UniProtKB/Swiss-Prot annotation:
F(1)F(0) ATP synthase produces ATP from ADP in the presence of a proton or sodium gradient. F-type ATPases consist of two structural domains, F(1) containing the extramembraneous catalytic core and F(0) containing the membrane proton channel, linked together by a central stalk and a peripheral stalk. During catalysis, ATP synthesis in the catalytic domain of F(1) is coupled via a rotary mechanism of the central stalk subunits to proton translocation. Component of the F(0) channel, it forms part of the peripheral stalk, linking F(1) to F(0). It is a single-pass membrane protein. It holds the Pfam family ATP-synt_B. HAMAP family: ATP_synth_b_bprime. The gene is atpF. This is ATP synthase subunit b, organellar chromatophore. It comes from Paulinella chromatophora. Coiled coil: none annotated.
Length: 174
């Protein structure tokens, strides 16, 4: 039995481990990696730098938007507080005005009722005076009528002339 311990380390062709540094791809790999590192470092560095700048710009824009939103929020809150204060003033003014209108309306109603009562009293007084005058007039007419009926029988010629003279004197004094 012939055992070959190094069948994988063939000198010609195939797969094997070559320990000669000049013959190996190690130098080629180092050169390729060095060239890639040299050229890609600038390209990747620029790409990463652009990405970093874009991220910083986006972050700066976001911070600016946050500041603008905060300013707008503060302004809106101030406007809201002012609007609420104005609404409270309008409500208070409205309540005051409504109360004033109610009081004025009540006062005018009371005044109108008092005026109606005074008018009714005045009308009643005027009606009483008119009725009283009418009753006096009717009473006077009835008295005159009765006197006219009874007077000719009760008056003689001297009493009649005396009555006429006295009536003339009364008319002259009046």
């Amino acid at each position: 039995m012939n055992f070959n311990l190094f069948p994988l380390f063939a000198v010609e062709g195939g797969f094997g481990l070559n320990l000669n540094p000049l013959d190996t791809n190690l130098i080629n790999l180092i050169i390729v990696i060095g060239v890639l590192f040299t050229f890609l470092r600038g390209f990747l560095g620029e790409m990463l730098e652009r990405r970093r700048q874009a991220i910083l710009a986006n972050l700066s824009d976001a911070e600016q938007n946050l500041k603008n939103a905060s300013v707008a929020l503060n302004k809106a809150q101030l406007d809201l507080a002012e609007a609420q204060e104005r609404a409270a003033r309008i409500l208070a003014d409205g309540k005051t005005r409504a109360e004033s209108i109610r009081v004025n309306s009540e006062r005018r109603t009371i005044d109108a009722m008092a005026a109606l009562k005074q008018d009714a009293i005045a009308d009643l007084s005027a009606e009483m005076v008119r009725i009283s005058e009418e009753l006096r007039l009717q009473t006077a007419l009835q008295a005159i009528e009765k006197a006219m009926v009874t007077l000719p029988t009760k008056l003689d010629e001297t009493a009649h002339s005396k009555l006429i003279d006295q009536s003339i004197v009364n008319l002259e004094q009046a």
